[in-house]
């Protein structure tokens, strides 16, 4: 059957019990039947079905997939008998926006509320770029993504991350495939700093898998004082167009909350009365305990972006100058500058780090092309699109190691210092002939010799780098149509 999820959505819209665009106050009241509140008024929800994404239960249908169709047909009667809230919003607010419809099972009003809060208002037209049907009460767990129709069926999960990413996954790839730009799993921020005596605005995109410090570096203001400043646009997904504009996709934020005690700038956004805490332990007096991970290591919040002191008035970054890829690999220096657009895209497609799984908490080496677990096929299109953008916009691209250089820990304060130093162009570089990129040897007055992997590994460095290079080349050659990038690592 072609476009079976789209057909299911059509039947739901024609026959199911649907309440259209319920106001947030109603959704909050309905959610309070099973949720609590913090002392500041934030809604606090504990998921009953799922507390993290399930990539192993996510299935994407591109053209024909009989197994996919059977899963949808098996759920058909159950879905059409359910009652739904219909939430009409937009991913993005500018000329790269997509109209979306979330059909959320009525028994889970907090999911409808979070969708309303997270995405932008854009009126009711009856025509949508993406549609998701979300039925958490279903007995089996599946995220069924139908690429051609841009429709998703979420079954058996009440974790908001699945609903949110059902739209953002498709928006990123739709932007790429429509040649509107390229969707990127990256945070965006603007620096206004003094460079060589004159004020300059520098737009930065920060990429990184979970656990690499992306949120920490995104909300960092470096203690700058007027006329210098930092403004935060987005923390997760942007669409970078051919003019260098990084279009924001979300009105608010969805951060992990275990970082809140260290990132005080996030606190007002997470504790805002309109915020929604998801699987955060709340004490009997209404105080959230962000350090208690007994419910899950993946506790999150739908946080109110405008409450962050350094939030920008706009979610769109109007000019992108710098890309920063965060990694945690012991062979990498604290900061490296990539020397060509091809090398930059090679590292983009490597998407490598050590990361901690959301539930198990066990560090493991990983490679995810584009630092983006939501990138759909054909992945080579993202590589070629970014290559064209880096060439045409003359962007500088860096790799920042936020883990260890060999076994020496790289402190977060050093990473923050390096980010500001590269934005201010206050870094001395030296070519690492073995790696083929430039490494920072001094930044903003700080000597980095003690973190140079070549010195730390000593005589074994060449062997370590050679093994790493061969491993990287093998990975890149496994991605169709980008094997040529193996020559640049």
UniProtKB/Swiss-Prot annotation:
Source taxon at top rank: Archaea
Binding site for substrate: 53, 159, 300
Keywords from the UniProt entry: ATP-binding, Cytoplasm, Decarboxylase, Gluconeogenesis, Lyase, Nucleotide-binding
Pathways involved: Carbohydrate biosynthesis; gluconeogenesis
Gene Ontology annotations of biological process type: gluconeogenesis
Positions contributing to ATP binding: 185, 208-216, 258, 300, 409-410, 415
Pfam families hit by this protein: PEPCK_ATP (PF01293)
Annotated S-S bridges: none
Catalytic EC class: lyase
EC numbers, comma separated: 4.1.1.49
UniProt xrefs under InterPro entries: PEP_carboxykinase_ATP (IPR001272), PEP_carboxykinase_C (IPR013035), PEP_carboxykinase_N (IPR008210)
One Gene Ontology cellular component: cytoplasm
Keyword Lyase: yes
HAMAP family attached to this UniProt entry: PEPCK_ATP
Its job: Involved in the gluconeogenesis. Catalyzes the conversion of oxaloacetate (OAA) to phosphoenolpyruvate (PEP) through direct phosphoryl transfer between the nucleoside triphosphate and OAA.
Name this polypeptide is given: Phosphoenolpyruvate carboxykinase (ATP)
Organism: Aeropyrum pernix (strain ATCC 700893 / DSM 11879 / JCM 9820 / NBRC 100138 / K1)
Native organism taxonomy: Archaea, Thermoproteota, Thermoprotei, Desulfurococcales, Desulfurococcaceae
Underlying gene: pckA
């Amino acid at each position: 059957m072609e476009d079976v999820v789209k057909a299911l959505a059509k039947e739901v819209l024609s026959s199911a019990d649907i309440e259209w665009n319920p106001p947030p106050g109603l959704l909050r009241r309905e959610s309070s039947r099973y949720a609590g509140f913090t002392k500041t008024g934030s809604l606090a929800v504990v998921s009953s079905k799922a507390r993290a994404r399930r990539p192993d239960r996510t299935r994407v249908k591109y053209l024909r997939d009989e197994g996919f169709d059977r899963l949808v047909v098996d759920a058909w009667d159950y879905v059409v008998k359910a009652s739904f809230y219909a939430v009409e919003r937009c991913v993005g607010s500018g000329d790269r926006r997509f109209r979306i419809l979330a059909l959320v099972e009525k028994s889970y009003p907090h999911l409808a509320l979070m969708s309303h809060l997270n995405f932008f208002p854009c009126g009711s037209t009856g025509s949508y770029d993406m549609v998701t049907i979300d039925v958490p009460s279903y007995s089996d767990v599946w995220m069924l993504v139908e690429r051609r129709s841009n429709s998703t069926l979420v079954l058996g999960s009440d974790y908001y991350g699945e609903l949110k990413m059902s739209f953002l996954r498709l928006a990123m790839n739709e932007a790429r495939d429509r040649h509107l730009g390229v969707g990127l799993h990256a945070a965006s921020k603007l620096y206004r700093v003094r460079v060589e005596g004159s004020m300059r605005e520098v737009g930065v995109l920060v990429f990184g898998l979970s656990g690499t410090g992306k949120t920490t570096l995104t909300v960092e203001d470096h203690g700058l004082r007027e006329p210098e400043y930092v403004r935060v646009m987005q923390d997760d997904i942007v669409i970078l167009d051919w003019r260098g504009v990084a279009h924001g996709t979300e009105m608010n934020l969805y951060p992990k909350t275990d970082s809140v005690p260290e990132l005080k700038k996030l606190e007002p956004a997470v504790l805002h009365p309109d915020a929604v805490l998801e699987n955060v332990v709340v004490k009997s007096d209404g105080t959230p305990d962000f350090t208690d991970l007994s419910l899950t290591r993946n506790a999150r919040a739908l946080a109110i972006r405008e409450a962050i002191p350094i939030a920008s008035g706009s979610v769109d970054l109007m000019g992108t100058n710098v890309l920063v890829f965060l990694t945690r690999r012991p062979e990498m220096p604290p900061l490296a500058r990539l020397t060509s657009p091809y090398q930059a895209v090679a590292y983009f497609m490597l998407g490598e780090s050590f990361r901690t799984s959301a539930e198990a908490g066990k560090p493991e080496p990983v490679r995810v092309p584009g630092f983006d677990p939501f990138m759909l096929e054909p992945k080579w299109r993202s590589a070629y699109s970014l290559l064209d953008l880096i060439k045409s916009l003359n962007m500088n691209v860096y790799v920042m190691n936020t883990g260890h250089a060999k076994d020496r820990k790289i402190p977060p304060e050093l990473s923050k210092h390096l980010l500001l130093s590269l934005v201010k162009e206050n870094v001395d570089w030296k070519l690492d002939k073995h790696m083929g990129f430039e490494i920072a040897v001094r930044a903003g007055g700080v000597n980095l010799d003690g973190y140079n992997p070549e010195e730390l590994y000593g005589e074994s460095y060449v062997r370590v780098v050679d093994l790493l290079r061969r491993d990287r080349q093998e990975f890149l050659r496994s991605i169709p149509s980008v094997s040529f990038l193996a020559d640049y690592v």
